Amino acid sequence: MTDYKATLNLPDTAFPMKAGLPQREPQILQRWDSIGLYQKLREIGKDRPKFVLHDGPPYANGKIHIGHALNKILKDMIVRSKTLAGFDAPYVPGWDCHGLPIEHKVEVTHGKHLSADRTRELCREYAAEQIEGQKTEFIRLGVLGDWDNPYKTMNFANEAGEIRALAEMVKQGFVFKGLKPVNWCFDCGSALAEAEVEYADKKSQTIDVAFPVADETKLAAAFGLASLAKPAAIVIWTTTPWTIPANQALNIHPEFKYALVDTGERLLVLAEELVESCLKRYNLEGSIIATAQGSALELINFRHPFYDRLSPIYLADYVELGAGTGVVHSAPAYGEDDFVTCKRYGMVNDDILTPVQSNGVYVESLPFFGGQFIWKANPAIVEKLSEVGALMHTETISHSYMHCWRHKTPLIYRATAQWFVGMDKQPTTGEPLRERALKAIEDTKFVPAWGQARLHSMIANRPDWCISRQRNWGVPIPFFLHKQTGELHPRTVELMEQVAKRVEQEGIEAWFKLDAAELLGVEADQYDKITDTLDVWFDSGTTHWHVLRGSHDIGHTTGPVADLYLEGSDQHRGWFHSSLLTGCAIDNHAPYRELLTHGFTVDENGRKMSKSLGNTIEPEKVNNTLGADILRLWVSATDYSGEMAVSEQILQRSADAYRRIRNTARFLLSNLSGFDPARDLLAPEDMLALDRWAVDRTLLLQRELEEHYSEYRFWNVYSKVHNFCVQELGGFYLDIIKDRQYTTGANSVARRSCQTALYHISEALVRWIAPILAFTADEIWQYLPGERNESVMLNGWYQGLSELPEGTELDRAYWDRVMAVKASVNKELENQRTAKVIGGNLQAEVTLYADEGLSADLGKLGDELRFVLITSAASVVPFAQAPAEAVATEVEGLKLKVVKSGHAKCGRCWHFRADVGSHPEHPEICSRCVDNLSGSGEVRHYA
């Protein structure tokens, strides 16, 4: 028996079936580094239009987690796809380096006894060490960027750039000093930004407190009475007993009705709507003797329960009837609304009582409670209120309360002298900042679109931005204040530039060691040099200034400096927010054209990632077991606009999908064996009809994918590429061409046409997957035939695809109908295999009973229909001749019948044909194979 295997064009490639990504990816990284891939991209892109994705800096602390990996991979997919689309898309990674978490780490490691200078030195060392660790992890994910020259907010140039950005805002009149309640953490000893506040349940003691009336006559008149027959008091309700010593006013709503209630021993003023619930709470009976509009009670004085001072009634719209008494006690130093209302009524800063120190302890001079920590003083305050007869009721409740994101301890609002960026302050020219920012939001594209309303609401309702902190490890606010007037030095902007130049050379340490006389000369004795540092959100919020137009200078020169900012949804109140404010203050527009927001990672049950739950996924572990390309494929396959589920099981599914894509690539490469595009590539008009369709289908898909990439719809890219590999290629085209590819002459038109199509598909596919499967695409690139440059990334989308010409007889619609027929035939072949009527598809002969239109369509393929259906014989008969046993199909006008072939099997092509054995020299094969071996070779036109 002759072995005909050697006469076949069997697939052959060195491209490995087993990916071995954990071992192979580091080798590919080394190759990218050795060829200077990132630098080469900058060289070839210098004359291209620019696309700037600006990296929101992760904090330089700890190992990266799955959220970091998700974020960086998304950014990399965009940068790579924009590069392939013909843009110069530089990517400069960055790190946020200053701030409390690093200072806290240093204190924990080295103790709190350190000098400020030593603290800064150790913080700088710690941040540098953390950056190196994170950098290695990010590079391992395949993220392409300027890793040798990242930006760091602690680099001297960037620290100086922040000071210059602040100087611009000072010059334009946005910065002011004010006493104002800010989020205050006792453990940090500093104000916190809104983004550093989180909410958690807290148990609080609520109290209802009676404030005796001081103006009896006015109160009686307000209620339409000649006089008060009994002592009277107004009752407040609060969850913060510790603020009672700082009470300076009482707030009621101007439009609510208030009742004067006779409870027997005294009269109580309560919101009319809440009288019943209040009396029940106080275990009292009473009756309403008069009512008055809230506005009628304005400026009536009541007495503080245990201090000799008055508390006037101020009207305020923020008073609610949801709980309490309808009366709010006002401690302007410890409540934002209280502060605003008291200021509106003319209270000046010097009048505001601030008995709570930065560590949460009352000043020693405070009567009754001096020297006590506020949370521990609550019982003593309640006891004092009870002692003076002012306590109406007390109970403990659990409610959502603000906590420090770092220490997880409760915060308070605390009025301190801080530096602010004014939201509604009139600048030297143009509109106030809030107005500018809201307009800029309208000019920004949001992905997903709901981000616009969210950021708009935050900007519309936010208070002035407190930019000062009382910490060591931060960029200084280099101000000199006049000792008598408290005013900024008249040459502040000029002095800030002098400081910036020093910081550029020596870092922030230059300010802290500076002797004021070096800059002020004889004036130095008249000025205080302040030691406040900038909020870290100012550090990252001004990177558009000190990075994109400073240390790295890659931004656009007109309009927004960056095309895209991309971060998690929490950054609407973080980096997106601070960048918008600084951009609008300095340039009068946002620093970005587009904002993309991604959701947070959760496990497969929708639970947050938590070490305590044991459901975290470590990127390093995934890299070392499955490979970074699997993580990248998971990112691409998941709609990032909501929560993104990830688990070992989900990643395993991604690994399965990866194998299907890799196997498709391997099939393509193995069937390009012996193909040299310079020698063997056929022109479209010389190719077989099915091959031309395959190239046309590839072109149509590429157009779709380019659009999905440009709109950042990576999950659509993934699903379409995966379906193309599994269905249109694996389930249709690649199966059909095997016979032609393996059995026809090695240099025949039939085979070279097929290889030409496979080559075009491969060139397109390797580029499609390059932004997602960065490592695998570059690996495939090395195995493709023909001369090529060193990396797939040094190219654009493939331009060698051709469209089916207008008026082509076997057009797209035609092949869609053929695919539908083939699907129906496959279904019946499967049934016959299951029933053991046939062993394999080639053992089948199929008769298609088709209506006139379908019959004409199928007839166009002639004898080549059997190759499309992958059966040994296929015939088309009029639909009316279908016997009773013919099987109905889902295709209209089609029935079919499958029978087992009665012929012998060809030992070479495995078709069952009547002419097997008809050639005496080759008794084991069919005449078609004989012709392909020793004759002129078979001629194919269609498939």
UniProtKB/Swiss-Prot annotation:
It catalyses: tRNA(Ile) + L-isoleucine + ATP = L-isoleucyl-tRNA(Ile) + AMP + diphosphate. The keyword Protein biosynthesis applies. A motif ('KMSKS' region) lies at residues 608-612. ATP binds at residue 611. GO terms for molecular function: aminoacyl-tRNA deacylase activity; ATP binding; isoleucine-tRNA ligase activity; tRNA binding; zinc ion binding. Pfam families: Anticodon_1, tRNA-synt_1, zf-FPG_IleRS. Its main location: cytoplasm. Catalyzes the attachment of isoleucine to tRNA(Ile). As IleRS can inadvertently accommodate and process structurally similar amino acids such as valine, to avoid such errors it has two additional distinct tRNA(Ile)-dependent editing activities. One activity is designated as 'pretransfer' editing and involves the hydrolysis of activated Val-AMP. The other activity is designated 'posttransfer' editing and involves deacylation of mischarged Val-tRNA(Ile). Monomer. HAMAP family: Ile_tRNA_synth_type1. This is Isoleucine--tRNA ligase. It comes from Pseudomonas putida (strain GB-1).
